[in-house]
Amino acid sequence: MVQSAPASEIAALILRGFDDYREQFREITDGARARFEQAQWQEAQRASAQRINLYEEKVAETVAGLRAGLADSELLDVERWPIIKSAYIAQIDLRLDDELAETWFNSIFCGLFSHDNISDGTMFVHTTRPSLRAHARAPYTRTYRPGGDLRQALEKIFDDYRFDVPYDDRERDLERIDALLHSNLPDWVCKDPDLAIELIGSVFYRNKGAYLVGRLFTPDEQWPLVFPLLHREGHGIQFDTVITDEAEVSIIFSFTRSYFMVDVPVPAELVAFLKRLLPGKHLAELYTSIGFYKQGKSEFYRALINHLATTDDRFVMAPGVRGMVMSVFTLPGFNTVFKIIKDRFNPSKSVDHATVIQKYQLVKNHDRVGRLADTQQFADFRFPVSKFEPECLAELLEVAPSTVVMEGDVVLIRHCWTERRMTPLNIYLENASEAQTREALNDYGLAIKQLAAANIFPGDMLLKNFGVTRHGRVVFYDYDEICYLTEVNFRYIPEPRFPEDEMSSEPWYSVGPNDVFPEEFPRFLFVDLNQRRLFAKLHGNLYDAKYWQGLQEQIREGKVIDVFPYRRQETPEQLLK
């Protein structure tokens, strides 16, 4: 039954939906410890996907409840929403997750109104939190002061973070971690009487790993500190290594990784702590890395509009080979690409618009194993015409007129994805040294193998569809043909029936829609013969259908790959054993 409601009551209903979302988010997150202790790896993957989908499900549920309980004349009167927003601000002022509550309000507003109603008066285009936030710190870290006795501090850490599953070999791990810290850090650090170790109280869980995250610091310097932990089934918990290199820690929090499960009483405080460890990371990426991807989206959007307002940067087409399905543009001074679906695809492409959207959602929900770039989806972006180079705007209007629309002096982009900008692998190799070429091609092969072991087949594996990150990692970013590895039928090319068969431009054998012939990869993937020969030496087993069939068999048996976001010696083949 619809009824009349004051603004404060509507605000309370919106906040009640947020509380429901946060409670279920915490419930899923809190289960990560038990899943790690019980080695429930497939359940961990399901929980990750469930938590990603939870936000949109709860937004839809809240919007439906508002529509059912309130008259349209009250709910859909946009003139009332500045009053509702003010009432909402008063209700979230004392919360410890208030910035997330603002983003939730925005999501509800966008679920009720078209995007042309968006303004800072009706929703939180700009946050109100920094000037209002109470500065009481939550006790979310533990501090250890070795006083020259690092071993004793490590023993205390092992005790404080113990699990219900015993350590595999506590003494061995203590000795190894102690030795690694002494070798990784300058000689004087471990002896410094003022050295302190500060660790976040909550454990970070992701896939088959757990991580203790913090820092080592003296009065003058600091180093990030990460202890990766593994559960070796049948043996126990193992401190796998210790990481103090900022670049390596940055990779652990990379945009190519799945989101961490970590208890976060005060999100802004945790993100601020991580930002001190990783100053090169944007707030958007840090919020996203701990599961608050919608907050990451808000922070990204605010950074984007600030960049456009404070620079002369203009959108240009992204460098690289033009895509057959997507058109990609970028801002030179903003480390992001914007991807839109073309109205018409190249005839060789069998996908449609709906399929492309499904592929991007698959990537969002799946374990990205450090080899798939995360994306954010946006609707109804509006930019001034003056922010586009004429050639860029003309191309976008030509290839995607249903998505890119002129509205006077404003360009409306109805739908797009944003993604971290990388150097296309084919362009990277054009200027690479011999050593860089070998390293990049080796990582390209590892990327394909790690994706395959995680049940992902890229489909179109051309070099142009992979990018190189600032840390030199090779990442796949073209998703229109991506699929589960177990959906593919890997075959050997049949022997020719007659000598003439080999000379024919058409195959002498039938080819199904999911058939893939790995023997054809060398010719399709590499025009450069030197690169082709080098890749065959590095990863020649990718050309053998039996290799792929073996991976499929192990995936169907329920094996979950170990892919470590830090340096290890194992190959992808060994990790499945």
UniProtKB/Swiss-Prot annotation:
Query: Highest taxon of the source?
Result: Bacteria
Name the GO cellular-component terms: cytoplasm
Which positions in this protein are listed as binding ATP?
318-324, 339
| Compartment annotation | Cytoplasm
User: Which keywords annotate this record?
Assistant: ATP-binding, Cytoplasm, Glyoxylate bypass, Hydrolase, Kinase, Nucleotide-binding, Protein phosphatase, Serine/threonine-protein kinase, Transferase, Tricarboxylic acid cycle
Q: What reactions does this protein catalyze?
A: L-seryl-[isocitrate dehydrogenase] + ATP = O-phospho-L-seryl-[isocitrate dehydrogenase] + ADP + H(+)
Chief localization? cytoplasm
Gene Ontology biological process terms, A to Z: glucose metabolic process; glyoxylate cycle; tricarboxylic acid cycle
Q: Name one GO molecular function term.
A: phosphoprotein phosphatase activity
Q: What HAMAP family does UniProt report for this protein, alphabetically?
A: AceK (MF_00747)
Q: What is the recorded function of this protein according to its Swiss-Prot or TrEMBL entry?
A: Bifunctional enzyme which can phosphorylate or dephosphorylate isocitrate dehydrogenase (IDH) on a specific serine residue. This is a regulatory mechanism which enables bacteria to bypass the Krebs cycle via the glyoxylate shunt in response to the source of carbon. When bacteria are grown on glucose, IDH is fully active and unphosphorylated, but when grown on acetate or ethanol, the activity of IDH declines drastically concomitant with its phosphorylation.
The record's section on PANTHER family has: ISOCITRATE DEHYDROGENASE KINASE_PHOSPHATASE, PTHR39559
Q: Which family does it belong to?
A: Belongs to the AceK family.
The name this protein carries in UniProt is Isocitrate dehydrogenase kinase/phosphatase
